[in-house]
């Protein structure tokens, strides 16, 4: 979905999925409804493992990409820690504690979704869609003082030389792929 919808729109829908999953799981009254909303949350998690690092690597300056993608991974672990702590604190509130544990997930999900609205679209994605003026504006925003036309040319050259998934199955990659 990130190539079709764009990174930003995909990240927004991931936040919507997270929010609906949290609230739906907390308010579900039967196992099938509960499973449906947990599945919806799983779709959001799965999509975020691809969309978020892709967005970060495409929007970050080259010198900061590794650090920022690493920070994304750290934040996943930190989020798990916060979830354990919040679940511990909520565990003693009675027989509906599980509903609170699931429903409280909606708070960071809503905050995330609202913040996604303020981030710029990926300039690399914009260039692949031939939306050059929008890409130029984003590049000027995130790379002040740099030659934006040169950056656009470099990104376009990288996009042209990009190895697609279909190329992985050619003969020269077959043996390493099997390993």
Model-derived regions, located:
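Transmembrane-helix signature of 12-pass secondary carriers
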Residues: 1-179
């Amino acid at each position: 979905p990130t190539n079709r919808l764009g990174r930003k729109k995909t990240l927004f829908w991931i936040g919507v999925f997270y929010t609906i999953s949290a609230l739906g799981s907390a308010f579900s009254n039967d196992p099938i409804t509960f499973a449906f909303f947990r599945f919806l949350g799983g779709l959001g998690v799965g999509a975020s493992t691809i969309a978020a690092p892709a967005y970060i690597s495409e929007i970050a300056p080259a010198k900061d990409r590794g650090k920022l993608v690493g920070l994304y991974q750290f934040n996943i672990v930190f989020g798990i820690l916060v979830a354990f702590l919040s679940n511990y604190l909520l565990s003693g509130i009675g027989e509906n504690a599980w509903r609170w544990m699931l429903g409280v997930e909606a708070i960071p999900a809503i905050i995330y979704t609202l913040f996604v609205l303020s981030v710029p679209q990926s300039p690399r994605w914009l260039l692949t869609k031939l939306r050059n003026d929008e890409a130029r504006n984003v590049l000027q925003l995130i790379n002040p003082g740099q030659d934006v036309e040169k950056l656009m040319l470099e990104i376009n050259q990288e996009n042209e030389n990009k190895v697609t998934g279909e190329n992985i199955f050619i003969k020269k990659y077959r043996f390493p792929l099997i390993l």
